[in-house]
């Protein structure tokens, strides 16, 4: 037995030696190259496992793509080209500048101390606004608009993170000023587009059984239905189309932006909104860069008693995606607004600027241009026709001026900028290299219909 075992051991050693000679990357004497390959293999395996966890965990939050009759209707839109929606003016992306800004982001991009928030007493809604128009800003782009006896929620985001995952992604700085189930009855929920900071899965899922009408751009209804909202509670509109909800006219207006959740990039439309009541009018820009049709919005649907225009989350690397404060003031004038409420700031860190910079620059630009502006605390309501004076509730922190960090949209006719005092705060727009522009619309597509001529779309809740 001992001799047999010894011969077997010797044979094993010989085989191991021959194997190591033939395959030096394996075994205890493998090369550094082999070890690196093995580590890379494990890394790819772990990365794949992480990606699988992300997809599984966030699958429902990613939403659902359009199909069937919904997709056919989308394909008939003048904004639809080559399988997706496009802007009339291509949007500029300067990736080199974006990466540069990433490494020079402001240390003040999020608050160091708790943000001042007004907790909302639900009893306040029992008393209608004296002048017929009252607005409560919840932070970012979420507002409750009470206009001529109707209540409208814009882009409600009550979730903790603007992400498909509950454990990673931009986290809100403070809880919502009021619980969703404490809100009064809502007549309409208006969504501007399907980015996570405007269309929140957790919020919609909590609202799916509400007796309300969801008014959304083309394609967004597929997400809502997938999350349980009844189809007859959803109205989808193209630019310049309109509907009525219990007597309040809601008009879908153009915007210059993009859309996308996971694999669904630019498969749904983005938009702004006009709320047209018997006595008052409100304009909500949604996410947008500057674009010429803003003048047409004002001419066809204005003047507006209140504009709610996005001012934050801008960057020099994406100057056409967001207005920035100075161009927001210009947009307010173009759409013929009376009182300007800056939104899309004060809740999340989604860009590299200081968190107070949007409101600081908005105040400077509004004063320079003679524009009425309001800056309520999150949760604070105000009467749009008699707004309170601006009180600084945010801390004084360092921020960059328009001269230091200008945001200037590309491909804008010079005449659009003429006669607006705030614009000297900005340098002249630089020429856009053709290589940085997105593809132009396909030849032969029908032109966009004239503003204000879009068809009316009926809603079951008129």
Where are these regions (language model features)?
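Active-site-proximal loop/helix segment associated with metal-binding centers of metalloenzymes
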Residues: 158, 254-277, 393-417
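Active-site metal-binding motif and surrounding structural segment of the metallo-beta-lactamase
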Residues: 76-77, 167-215, 302-308
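Metallo-beta-lactamase
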Residues: 2-171, 176-180, 217-286, 305-312, 361-379, 385-386, ...
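Acidic/histidine-rich helix-loop elements
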Residues: 158-175, 258-264, 315-321, 349
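Active-site-proximal loop/helix segments of hydrolase catalytic cores
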Residues: 202, 257-335, 356-361
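Binuclear metal-ion centers of metallo-dependent hydrolases, dominated by the metallo-beta-lactamase
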Residues: 2-11, 38-44, 213, 228-246, ...
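Active-site neighborhood of phospho(di)ester-bond hydrolases with catalytic His/Asp-centered motifs
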Residues: 153-155, 185-194, 215-217, 236, ...
């Amino acid at each position: 037995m001992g001799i047999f075992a010894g011969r077997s051991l010797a044979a094993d050693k010989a085989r191991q030696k021959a194997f190591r000679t033939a395959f030096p990357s394996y075994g205890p004497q493998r090369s550094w190259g082999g070890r690196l390959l093995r580590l890379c293999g494990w890394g790819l395996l772990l990365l794949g496992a992480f990606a699988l966890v992300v997809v599984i965990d966030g699958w429902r939050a990613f939403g659902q793509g359009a199909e069937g009759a919904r997709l056919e209707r989308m394909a008939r839109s003048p904004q639809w080209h080559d399988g997706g929606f496009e802007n009339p003016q291509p949007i500029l992306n300067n990736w080199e500048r974006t990466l540069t800004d990433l490494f020079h982001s402001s240390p003040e991009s999020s608050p160091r101390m708790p943000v001042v928030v007004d907790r909302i007493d639900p009893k306040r809604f029992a008393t209608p606004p004296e002048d017929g128009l009252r607005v409560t800003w919840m932070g970012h782009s979420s507002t409750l608009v009470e206009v001529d006896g109707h209540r409208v929620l814009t882009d409600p985001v009550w979730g903790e993170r603007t992400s498909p995952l509950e454990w990673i992604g931009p986290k809100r700085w403070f809880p919502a000023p009021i619980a969703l189930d404490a809100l009064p009855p809502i007549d309409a929920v208006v969504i501007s587009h399907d980015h996570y900071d405007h269309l929140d899965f957790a919020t919609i899922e909590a609202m799916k059984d509400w007796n309300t009408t969801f008014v959304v751009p083309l394609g967004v209804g597929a997400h809502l239905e997938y999350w349980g909202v009844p189809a007859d509670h959803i109205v989808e509109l193209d630019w310049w189309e309109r509907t009525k909800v219990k007597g309040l006219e809601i008009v879908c207006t153009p915007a210059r932006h993009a859309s996308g959740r996971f694999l669904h990039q630019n498969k749904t439309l983005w938009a702004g909104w006009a709320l047209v009541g018997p006595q008052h009018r409100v304009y909500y820009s949604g996410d947008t860069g500057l674009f010429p049709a803003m003048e047409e919005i004002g001419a066809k649907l204005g003047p507006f008693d209140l504009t709610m225009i996005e001012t934050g989350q801008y960057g020099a690397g994406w100057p056409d995606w967001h207005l920035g404060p100075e161009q927001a003031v210009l947009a307010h004038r173009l759409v013929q607004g009376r009182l300007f409420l800056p939104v899309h700031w004060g809740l999340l860190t989604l860009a590299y600027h200081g968190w107070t910079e949007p409101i600081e620059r908005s105040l400077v630009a509004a004063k320079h241009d003679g524009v009425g502006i309001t800056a309520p605390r999150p949760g604070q309501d105000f009467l749009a026709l008699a707004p309170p004076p601006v009180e600084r509730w945010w801390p004084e922190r360092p921020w960059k001026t328009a001269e230091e960090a200008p945001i200037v949209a590309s491909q804008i006719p010079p005449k659009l900028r003429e006669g607006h005092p705030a614009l000297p705060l900005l340098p002249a727009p630089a020429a856009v290299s053709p290589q940085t522009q997105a593809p132009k619309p396909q030849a032969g597509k029908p032109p966009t219909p004239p503003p204000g001529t879009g068809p009316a779309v009926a809603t079951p809740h008129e």
